[in-house]
Amino acid sequence: MKDAAQRLGVWALVLIALVAVAVLAACAPEVRPLAPVEGGAPAGFPEREYRQAAADGRAVYRVDPARSLVVIEVRRAGSLARLGHDHVVASHDVGGYVLPDAGRADLYVRLDRLVVDEPDLRAEAGFETKPSADAIAGTRRNMLERVLEAERYPFALVSVKGVRGEGVSRVATVAITLHGATRTMDVPLEVESRAASIEVSGELTFAQSDFGIVPLSILGGAIEVQDAVRLRFRIEAGSGA
């Protein structure tokens, strides 16, 4: 029985980390009808190809948003950084499919569904400050409008290009599209296979500027957002989900 190696691991964004799912196990359970992605996929997303593969009897896995999580830690910088806050941005709405026998996976994150500074995630990140509700709302608004330009670029996309390694530890090469720019990177993964699903987790650090994103800065840079952000992810996908 072949340990399903080719799948994915991110974002970011984003992401990113989403990439992970590609590592689905090829020793899949019986093929069941494939449910459509919830919430609407982006234009051009190859959902039809995955659904056709499932109809042909091939093992196709769908990402389970309720069991998946992508978290991005955004940290402050500048001479007056102590007056600002670090932030945690999360997606609970990762969508997409994995086709293990082709070593293929395509994932997406809707940026307008990102949430900011959930208390539990702030605690996990070790952030001790507690921004007010107004500060959180302002951070989210600035992120979507000024930083990510979410109306113009509403999705972050991940496409798996290959997976290397055996056993629990793998490395996925993925193309991430964010803010209209596509970058390819290697993402380390930890893979846990189960009877009817797989969980893939990992983390990476990337520069916002690599995607043409300009981190927010005020007071001449005295308070600003660091260019580098840390992304950690846990992606679960199952057959016929």
Question: Where are each of the predicted segments found?
Answer:
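Long, low-complexity, intrinsically disordered N-terminal extensions of eukaryotic proteins, enriched
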Residues: 2-3, 22, 30
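Bacterial N-terminal signal peptides
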Residues: 12-25
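Low-complexity, acidic/polar, glycine-enriched regions of mature
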Residues: 26-241
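Bacterial N-terminal signal peptides that target proteins for export
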Residues: 2-14
